[in-house]
Amino acid sequence: MAARWAAHGPGPGLDEFTVPAEKRRFLEGSRGRIQGLFEVRLAVLEAQGDWRPALPPPGQPPPAARIWVQLAGGGKAVRSAKEYIKGLCEPELEEKEYYPKDMHCIFVGAQNMFLNSLIQDTCADITVLEIGLLSIKGGAEAVVMAQSQVQQFVKLFENNESLSSECESDIKKQFRQFVEAHADKYTMDLLILPSSLKRELLTLMQTECCESRGAIIDLTGSKSPAELLQDKTSKVILTSRDGKMGDEEERNNAGTPVTELTKQMDNVFSDAPETSFVPINVVPPLEAMTSKERQSCKRRFSDAEESLPKKQLSLENDQEVKSVSHNDSSKRDAVIDLISDSSGELDDPSYCIKEGDDISEEIEYKILVNFFRTMGYSQSIVEKVIGVLGQSVEPLTLLEEIEKENLRFQKEQEWSSKTPKTTNLRLGSNANSSHKLEDEDISCKKNPLKTTHTSNETRTERHKARDMPSTQVDAEDKMHVSVCKPVSPDKSSAICYKKTDIYCPGKNHNSTSSDAETDGFVPLSPPQAGAPKDVDFVARGSSDVRCTSAKSKTAVHQKSAGPSPVQNSHSVVEDQLGHCSSYQVRSPNQHTSQMSNFENPTQAHVLSSEIHSANPDREVSGSHRRHIDPSITGVQRFLESLKKPYRLELKNEPGKPYLKHIIIDGSNVAISHGLRKFFSCRGIAIAVDYFWKRGHRNITVFVPQWRTRRDPSITEQDFLTQLEDVGILSLTPSRMVLGARIASHDDRFLLHLADKTGGVIVTNDNFREFVTESLAWREIIQKRLLQYTFAGDIFMVPDDPLGRNGPRLDDFLQSEGCSRDFLSAQKALQSREQYSSETPLFMHVPNPASSSQQPKNRAHGDHSAAWLPLDTNMKACLSIPPQRSASETVWLREALIKIFPDYEQRQKIDKILADHPFMRDLNALSAMVLD
């Protein structure tokens, strides 16, 4: 091969040599990649410069045509590039090398920095054929060197040798800074490589740095040598590895992984007195960095709900052409060919630095949380561990602690499931023990937080404000008795006792209601299907409750209203074991004296044994309680309720005429039933069943199409399939484009259908953003929204949807034609002056024994209706029901007692049932009890 030199040594040089002419097109296509790898300028000379050998001897074929190639740049760079090009065009050896699949991140991660450095060091062409397989070709010496280096990587990876603690810490820190400076979707895979392999990779990156006695961070890799010489002032010459950093620099280098990445980039745009060419993208050790003034880099990520398990991170640069989008990098991840892949990545502006952008610690926090969430860990556990250890800890350390915390949480859940009678609600302690369910993608907050501690504190307060009930209880006070004293005598809380902790939940003085909380009863223990009377509840109401604490060792959880024979033996003990409203606080000495007041000492022993046997599972020592938390959470209660089967049965029977179209906001209903943590399809089925039993047959449920995809936060999706089969479910359009979800606003479908059919929208959303859209929509939002609530699996709607002065529920759900006929019939009846003084007018009630069927009307105030035959055209709308039977009254009384278990309210329940013999509406009767 012919070659001629114009210069020698390390200075600028020029070299010309020949290659086969058929490689011209290949070299032209690889020009950008070669120039970026070796910092040289490549020129393929024109045809007139072609070199041809002398004529061959007779009888031999003529030699192939060759062309001249010219390289300009540093002497060493020119020699390396020449050897690399010769190996590409005329390879002497070609080998395949296998490696473990977990090492794939080395050859494709960190924006191909390690692979490029390996090519620069060995001058062999290395490409990734598939995961676990490399192709190495070039000169014989170059191929052997590359093979040896790859085999060394594999050996270090498989042996997984550890280094000394001090050395290992430095290596991890330097390696983390480097890979985060070239972040991509393989960043986390690189961070968990063995420390010995990390040291070898850093040595590979620093080899050229040592030879050239200086290190230059080059982030472009696309400029020619002439252009690079003009940009001297934009480079930084770093100090030697043995240089020591001052206290100020040590403080500057402390922080989270991303802030350290920022400090590593501080030197990029500062001035330098001199510069020299070295292989591209050489990063020095941390000790060699000189920090001037803080610049910044920005990490951008996608938080779509169905995104890939590994988030892709990148850096942005506004100086480059903005037409190249971030999606291009995700497409190139699927291309394994290094020749076509690397050149594009080197020129991609998404890997450069953007000046003037600040990295928010909130974004760093979200990156860590989202990464561990994709590994299957609960967000609350991840947030808890990061809050304790901080964001600057090694990811592998975080992973180990998260795994330990996850195992501890699973053991607590198993223990809690074995003690279903737990009544102690340790409020606020487990507010973060469940996943958040959000309808929209997570977005980055623009305002950065001051410190990591402030970030965690704010996030904890936000969880508590949403999930925590109104009453605040000190759960760390081990041996105390909280005594509930309601202000009003007619509204007292339920009995709740415990051996070490007794809590009486109620409304706090400063409690405020929010959209995420509904006004309903709070069961203190999971309901038992076979024994409904054993369930204790806290009566709902707005009365203030005062709770005091006293040291005590003895308490009882009473379930039945009647006291035991032993409790009847002494009035003092009866007072002490009675309701919270009559309980008096006593010191331990007073309690001991009361126990000794029994005539027979055996009685005191019997009572003490009964107290201990009443709750054997609550005999937990103080030290043991620190590890096992017996309190129950809303998520656990919801998951327990899913174990009770529910079957949706829509009977094939004609519905009632003159009823409005029911349009259900499926997302709103499902999230409300799932305690705002799950998308509960059972809630949608319960709502549909409620309106079906009322006689409605025109029912439509709108749910976004992406909710039909498999997701752990979506429960019992078979109900959606069942509703879709009968034509009740309608899916609003949504699609995925490049990993991002594009979904239509389902609320618009609700309003459009309500406008066309004159129907009623069942939702708790106020549609505030659509009030100004049109007058028709404003009228729908004002007059045709039906709110609801869930009490467990009971779907409840108000009797007065538009307020106290508005129409009743039955009138609200009737179509316009039937409402006009009803008003005209009432006027005709009133004109005849024939009234009944005792019998109110009711709509027909089918099968009052069903708890989900609702009555049709209710008399209010002093208004009374008439006992008159109805006209022919009114029989379809109205009919007079018979008086409530004794069995129905008993059933309603038992249902109300389940909701209001307090003895004082039972008298009120009996009075209401006696005063309203025609009332079958459980919702209306419950409202009367509360009134």
From Swiss-Prot:
It is found in: Cytoplasm, Cytosol; Nucleus; Nucleus, Nucleolus; Nucleus, PML body. Residues 416-434, 547-557 have a biased composition (Polar residues). Residues 659-811 form the RNase NYN domain. Transmembrane segments: none annotated. One of its GO terms (molecular function) is RNA nuclease activity. Residues 290-309, 319-329, 435-444, 456-467 have a biased composition (Basic and acidic residues). Residues 884-931 are annotated as: CoCUN. InterPro entries: KH_N4BP1_1st, KH_N4BP1_2nd, RNase_Zc3h12_NYN, UBA_N4BP1_C, ZC3H12/N4BP1_RNase_Reg. GO terms for cellular component: cytosol; nucleolus; nucleus; PML body. It comes from the Eukaryota. Keywords: Cytoplasm, Hydrolase, Immunity, Innate immunity, Nuclease, Nucleus, RNA-binding. This is NEDD4-binding protein 1. The gene is N4BP1.
